[in-house]
Amino acid sequence: MANPSKRIMNKKSKQASISSILNFFSFYIMEYFVAVDNETPLGVFTSMEQCEETMKQYPGLHYVVFKYTCPADAENTDVVYLIPSLTLHTPMFVDHCPNRTKQARHVLKKINLVFEEESIETWKVSVNTVFPHVHNRLSAPKLSIDEANEAVEKFLIQAGRLMSL
């Protein structure tokens, strides 16, 4: 676990990281996302503005589940991604299309200013227990809203187990 004294948690860095995440996702067509607060779905939203407002309003926000289609990759079907709230010192995961590698790495670096040295690999292992095909763009999962909620619940259980080890 990273040293809490090394955390960069001031308002400017958190806002910069939120902006970086939203700028990254603006490359894609967002279909919906589900925000989860303390393991309870807050609702389904359809705009970047709602996403940003939700992140600001809920300091205890755990995870946000995005479902969108990437127009830059014709092979890519609807994909579900998980990213954490910036207020939690937890691992994080952001996947991306092959031709968006530079932008994705930039976002990962920005988020790591907040999350520091948490293991991205550990996060990927835990995500794969919920979304076994998330890295395979030809068989990416297509989830309904209910299925997304269920996947989040399963993910939170798996993430809790990993973090308690």
From Swiss-Prot:
Q: How does it sit in the membrane?
A: Single-pass membrane protein
Q: Keywords in UniProt for this one? A: Host membrane, Late protein, Membrane, Transmembrane, Transmembrane helix
Q: Could you tell me where this protein is found in the cell?
A: Host membrane
What cellular component GO annotations does this protein have? Answer: host cell membrane; membrane
* Induction entry: Expressed in the late phase of the viral replicative cycle.
Keyword ATP-binding belongs to the record = no
The regions listed as transmembrane in this protein's record are 16-36
Q: Which family does it belong to?
A: Belongs to the asfivirus F165R family.
Any idea what this protein is called? Uncharacterized protein F165R
- Species this protein is from: African swine fever virus (isolate Pig/Kenya/KEN-50/1950)
